[in-house]
Curated annotation (Swiss-Prot):
Naturally occurring in which organism (per UniProt): Aeropyrum pernix (strain ATCC 700893 / DSM 11879 / JCM 9820 / NBRC 100138 / K1)
Binding sites annotated in the UniProt record for Mg(2+) 3: E365
Family label: Belongs to the class-II aminoacyl-tRNA synthetase family. Type 2 subfamily.
Main location: cytoplasm
Name this polypeptide is given: Aspartate--tRNA(Asp/Asn) ligase
Subcellular location field: Cytoplasm
InterPro entries, sorted: Aa-tRNA-synt_II, aa-tRNA-synth_II, aa-tRNA-synth_II/BPL/LPL, Asp-tRNA_synthase_2, Asp/Asn-tRNA-synth_IIb, NA-bd_OB-fold, NA-bd_OB_tRNA
Binding residues for Mg(2+) 2: E365, T368
Oligomer and partners: Homodimer.
Cofactor note (record): Binds 3 Mg(2+) cations per subunit. The strongest magnesium site (Mg1) is bound to the beta- and gamma-phosphates of ATP and four water molecules complete its coordination sphere.
Length: 442
């Protein structure tokens, strides 16, 4: 390996390394030429360190390599680690400078300060944008959230599954699916692993989770939607009610907050955002019908009875939770049947309403879930009431013919969780290579 440690590792161990020889590999982030002395800031994924090349001290080959060095050249430097009046408290006195690669044309996007450029430009030259430590921190956090998800649900007795992404039918009517060429059959990209999460529970795995891509053919042009994103999904059998599912979702949110407190402080400080708040008593739950009243009485916003919340309604309910309940999270529960999928369990005493929920995080829906209908005959009724053809979903209905436990689950948007944690303006910032109605490259 050309590189055996990150810059952050060197800085963390600087007391024991000062006076010794170190090797640093990364990109030339800044170059300052003072004639006889040249300062090169070398950046890698973990941080930045200063390297100094000085005439009369550094070897001639190092001086020659430094002479024509360009920004964003890939370099390896070797030399003595010594104390210096830098932010890191150390620098590398260069004894060897190796240029592994150099730009062949002017940079179309300056790495330093790239977050201030227009978003289309940043996404067009994403490989340069992500070199900016401010931007790469987003994806470090995203990886940390995914790891917390996996670790938390493993600890709760869940099994990780890997479901098909080429499917025979959408989870709904098929209006929001991407068709794909699949030999002589009709097929689509999966909107959700919903059917196969339920399959796994019914097949006896009982508690399952998945991290995977989902695809939505919705012609949105908003700062909150993507046509491809990563979904964090759970499904759990033998529940008493949908409250059991919400408890598992809340457990994951608390695990995220612990991670941020212990390992994510650097990223939060980089973005100047505070730790998310969850009351000790639990994430508050507000029935949607109560939310209608709150929105009208407190904010003068009227929502038609039986309708879903729009983005403004979600934002205002998030503000209400923050101001009145001291929580950055709030569950909105009992959604109308007409705005929920056919597999959602309806209330026996109020069939126009369902055992379902959304979780809002700082005013944006990041989780949708609920209890599923596990009774075969009720599923047939639900399909009929939705005006859907049962024959198109027969492969799914077959799962329920031989004993299905009461179960429920949730789908969580990874990018939305990161977006709300860092208070990003656009969800595309939280996706390494976003796909939307206008973008399919890079």
């Amino acid at each position: 390996m050309l590189k055996d440690r990150f810059i952050a590792d060197i800085i963390a161990s600087k007391e024991s390394l000062v006076g010794g020889r170190v090797r640093v590999c990364g990109w030339a982030y800044r170059i300052r030429d003072l004639g006889r002395l040249k300062f090169i800031l070398v950046r890698d994924r973990s941080g930045v360190i200063q390297a100094t090349v000085k005439r009369g001290e550094s070897p001639e080959d190092a001086l020659r390599a430094a002479e024509d060095l360009k920004l964003e050249s890939v370099v390896c430097v070797e030399g003595e680690l010594r104390q210096a009046p830098t932010r890191e408290g150390v620098e590398v006195k260069v004894e060897r400078l190796e240029v592994l690669s150099t730009p062949v044309e002017p940079l179309p996007l300056e790495v330093e300060g790239s977050e201030k450029a227009s978003l289309p430009t940043r996404l067009k030259y994403r490989w340069l944008d992500i070199r900016n430590p401010m931007v790469s921190a987003i994806f470090e956090l995203e990886a940390m959230v995914a790891k917390v998800f996996r670790d938390y649900y493993w600890s709760q007795g869940f099994v990780e599954i890997f479901t098909p992404k080429i499917v025979a039918a959408g989870t709904e009517s098929g209006a929001e699916v991407f068709p794909v060429v699949y030999f002589d059959k009709t097929a689509f990209l999966a909107q959700s692993p919903q059917f196969y999460k339920q399959f796994a529970v019914i097949a006896g795995l009982e508690r399952v989770f998945e991290i995977g891509p989902v695809f939505r053919a919705e012609p949105h042009h908003t700062s909150r939607h993507l046509n491809e994103y990563h979904s964090l999904d759970i499904e759990v059998g033998f529940i008493e009610s949908y409250n059991d599912v919400m408890n598992y979702v809340e457990g994951f949110m608390r695990a995220i907050v612990r991670m941020l407190e212990e390992d994510g402080r650097r990223v939060l400080e980089l973005y100047g955002v505070e730790l998310p708040r969850i009351p000790a008593s639990g994430i508050p739950k507000i029935p949607l019908r109560k939310a209608y009243e709150i929105l009208e009485e407190k904010y003068g916003k009227k929502v038609e009875y039986g309708e879903d919340l729009d983005s403004e309604g979600e934002r205002l309910m998030g503000a209400y939770a923050g101001e009145e309940l001291d929580s950055d999270f709030v569950f909105i529960v009992e959604y109308p049947w007409k705005v929920r999928p056919f597999y959602t369990m309806r209330k026996d005493d109020e069939p126009s309403w369902t055992y379902s929920f959304d979780l809002l995080y700082r005013g944006l829906e990041i989780v949708t879930g609920g209890q599923r209908e596990h009774r075969y005959h009720r599923l047939l009724e639900n399909l009929r009431d939705k005006g859907l053809d049962a024959e198109s979903f027969q492969f799914y209905l077959d799962f329920f013919k031989h004993g299905a436990p009461p179960h429920g689950g949730a789908g969580m948007g990874l990018e939305r969780i990161v977006m709300q944690t860092l208070k990003l303006e656009n969800i595309r910032e939280a996706r390494m290579l976003p796909r939307d109605t206008e973008r399919i490259t890079p």
